[in-house]
């Protein structure tokens, strides 16, 4: 028994280095690193670890009158539904929105931190931050933690002096401008609807209806998406929350 206890005591610590100040590089190569959540698309870590499944459907696209953003509201923990009422749009400032896909805590923390940094920028420069600058700021912040288990796929949507803006940013530091994105486990179903109905010259009501229908079809086919469909419109005067409908209530209207 004594030898067994000694063997346990001699287990290598998570870090041989003394406590480091915030922001300093740390060696996390010890056993606790086995509990890290693997990044999207990454290989499983060797040995026992946490296996977390993330499911959602979020989308955004640009058109002549701004940007339309639509999300579902279901959160899952593995194969179980954890919540049907998650708010997956982060209201960064009156002209900027961010979406959540991946780990809810990661998305919420980094986008709220982005909101604070955007406010600091506005106070220093006496003008609102552009969509491009806000997305670059987020990408730079999360890139410092690449490979450390963050799980985030977000869209930064807004309107600035250049017009509508839309960027995809993920936890690997990827930053891509685009006309339309769908992110999450139901994204392939949403893309099918968007690609068949999206046009640059759409009327606002038509664009809102298309986004709502795309999320509904994704929620219908993807077990990890559901709850309610919430739609936002971002225009020259900022964003507005247009509607929130329960998925079950939309079933008859879209010929389910």
Swiss-Prot record:
PROSITE patterns: PROTEASOME_BETA_1, PROTEASOME_BETA_2. The keyword Signal does not apply. Its EC number is 3.4.25.1. Residues 1-55 form a propeptide. It comes from the Eukaryota. GO terms for biological process: proteasome-mediated ubiquitin-dependent protein catabolic process. Pfam families: Proteasome. GO terms for molecular function: endopeptidase activity; threonine-type endopeptidase activity. It is found in: Cytoplasm; Nucleus. Keywords: Cytoplasm, Hydrolase, Nucleus, Protease, Proteasome, Threonine protease, Zymogen. Signal peptide: none annotated. Disulfide bonds: none annotated. SUPFAM superfamilies: N-terminal nucleophile aminohydrolases (Ntn hydrolases). One of its GO terms (cellular component) is nucleus. The active site is at 56 (nucleophile). It catalyses: Cleavage of peptide bonds with very broad specificity. Belongs to the peptidase T1B family. Component of the 20S core proteasome complex involved in the proteolytic degradation of most intracellular proteins. This complex plays numerous essential roles within the cell by associating with different regulatory particles. Associated with two 19S regulatory particles, forms the 26S proteasome and thus participates in the ATP-dependent degradation of ubiquitinated proteins. The 26S proteasome consists of a 20S proteasome core and two 19S regulatory subunits. The 20S proteasome core is a barrel-shaped complex made of 28 subunits that are arranged in four stacked rings. The two outer rings are each formed by seven alpha subunits, and the two inner rings are formed by seven beta subunits. The proteolytic activity is exerted by three beta-subunits PSMB5, PSMB6 and PSMB7. Directly interacts with POMP. Interacts with ABCB1 and TAP1. This is Proteasome subunit beta type-5. The lineage of its organism: Eukaryota, Metazoa, Chordata, Craniata, Vertebrata.
């Amino acid at each position: 028994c004594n030898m067994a206890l000694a063997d346990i005591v001699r287990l290598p610590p998570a870090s041989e280095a003394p406590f480091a100040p915030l922001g300093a590089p740390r060696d996390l190569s010890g056993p606790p690193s086995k509990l890290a959540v693997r990044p999207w698309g990454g290989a499983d870590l060797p040995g026992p670890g946490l296996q977390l499944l993330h499911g959602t459907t979020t989308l955004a696209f640009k058109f002549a009158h701004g940007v339309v953003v639509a999300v579902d509201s279901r959160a899952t923990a593995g194969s179980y539904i954890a919540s049907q009422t998650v708010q997956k749009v982060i209201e960064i400032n009156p002209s900027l929105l961010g979406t959540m896909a991946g780990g809810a805590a990661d998305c919420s923390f980094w986008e709220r931190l982005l909101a604070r940094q955007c406010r600091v920028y506005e106070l220093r420069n006496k003008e609102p931050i552009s969509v491009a600058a806000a997305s670059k700021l987020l990408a730079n912040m999360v890139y410092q933690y690449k490979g450390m288990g963050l799980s985030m796929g977000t869209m930064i949507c807004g309107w600035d002096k250049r017009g509508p803006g839309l960027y995809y940013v993920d936890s690997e530091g990827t930053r891509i401008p685009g006309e339309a994105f769908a992110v999450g486990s139901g994204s392939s179903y949403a893309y099918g609807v968007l690609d068949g109905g999206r046009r640059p010259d759409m009327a606002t009501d038509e664009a809102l209806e298309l986004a709502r229908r795309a999320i509904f079809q994704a929620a219908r086919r993807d077990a990890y998406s559901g709850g309610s469909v919430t739609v936002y419109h971002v225009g020259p005067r900022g964003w507005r929350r247009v509607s929130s409908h329960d998925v079950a209530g939309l079933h008859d209207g879209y010929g389910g």
